[in-house]
UniProtKB/Swiss-Prot annotation:
It comes from Salmonella paratyphi A (strain AKU_12601). This is 4-diphosphocytidyl-2-C-methyl-D-erythritol kinase. PANTHER family: 4-DIPHOSPHOCYTIDYL-2-C-METHYL-D-ERYTHRITOL KINASE, CHLOROPLASTIC. It catalyses: 4-CDP-2-C-methyl-D-erythritol + ATP = 4-CDP-2-C-methyl-D-erythritol 2-phosphate + ADP + H(+). Its EC number is 2.7.1.148. Belongs to the GHMP kinase family. IspE subfamily.
């Protein structure tokens, strides 16, 4: 049995710069990983079968991103003659990241499966090839595959590696799940934030265009942010529901965590520019 990190991400900022004819929104965002997340346990099989041993409630196995990623890699590697005969896997997950939280849990799971099985099966696909596969599973998958903090543009697929400060974060889940379409379909969502260079954006105060909608529509998000903002700069990650506050030291973050209200599920983690998944491969 092998063990693989599937880290969370934060959007340190997120600006929506337009909407394409196909309905997808264009954006500028800054991804950074956390040293906190899910863990995947993978045991290679020799009978060509993929088994997910820990099903997710309400999600059919064939719709689960873990299974879809494994089957996609199997298909593409087989078609290009790079899949050793009988390659399969038993996969289980220790889930710590909430669904609908804006921490990238499902995308991270898919990326970990692609990277881990490519290694375990010895398929030999490049990171570029794996990232291209990942994009067909979700816009956030490629950044997890590439494994480095990045400035993202387009619909999130145009990535430029960057090295923002590795701060400590108190991340809080307010107890609601926010489906991404709920935010992106809201008529009051800002959709025309001017595009700026990465250098300009890194000098500006960070914010998230989705935050005003999440706070308006979900009182739990509003309450969580109102509490965090009493202590430190805080904002929404992704389309929510998780919010985070940033601190210069772990001790400062933990002092605030100790005062968290009982209704708030929170943890402290460090921002890291190299993904824990890729540290595992070094």
């Amino acid at each position: 049995m092998t063990h693989w990190p599937s880290p969370a991400k934060l959007n340190l900022f997120l600006y929506i710069t337009g909407q394409r004819a196909d309905g997808y929104h264009t954006l500028q965002t800054l991804f950074q990983f956390l040293d906190y997340g899910d863990t995947l346990h993978i045991e290679p099989r020799r009978d060509g079968e993929i088994h997910l041993l820990t099903p997710v409630n309400g999600v059919e196995n064939e719709d689960n991103l873990i299974v879809r990623a494994a089957q996609l890699l199997m298909k593409i590697a087989s078609e290009s003659g790079r899949l050793p005969a009988g390659s399969g896997a038993d996969i289980s997950i220790e889930k710590r990241l909430p669904m609908g939280g804006g921490l990238g849990g499902g995308s991270s799971n898919a990326a970990t499966v692609l990277v881990a099985l490519n290694h375990l099966w010895q398929c030999g696909l490049s990171i570029d090839e794996l990232a291209t596969l990942g994009l067909t599973l979700g816009a956030d998958v490629p950044v997890f595959v590439r494994g480095h903090a990045a400035f993202a543009e387009g619909v999130g697929e145009i990535l430029t590696p960057v090295n923002p400060p590795e701060k400590w974060y108190l991340v809080a889940h307010p107890g609601v799940s926010i489906p991404t379409p709920v935010i992106f379909k809201d008529p009051q969502l800002p959709r025309n934030t001017p595009k700026r260079s990465i250098d300009t954006l890194l000098k500006c105060e960070f914010s998230n265009d989705c935050e005003v909608i999440a706070r308006k529509r979900f009182r739990e998000v509003d309450a969580a942010l109102s509490w965090l903002l009493e202590y430190a700069p805080s904002r929404l990650t992704g389309t929510g529901a998780c919010v985070f506050a940033e601190f210069d030291t772990e001790s400062c973050a933990r002092q605030v965590l100790e005062q968290a209200p009982e209704w708030l599920n929170a943890f402290v983690a460090k921002g890291v520019n190299l993904s824990p998944l890729h540290r595992e491969l070094l």
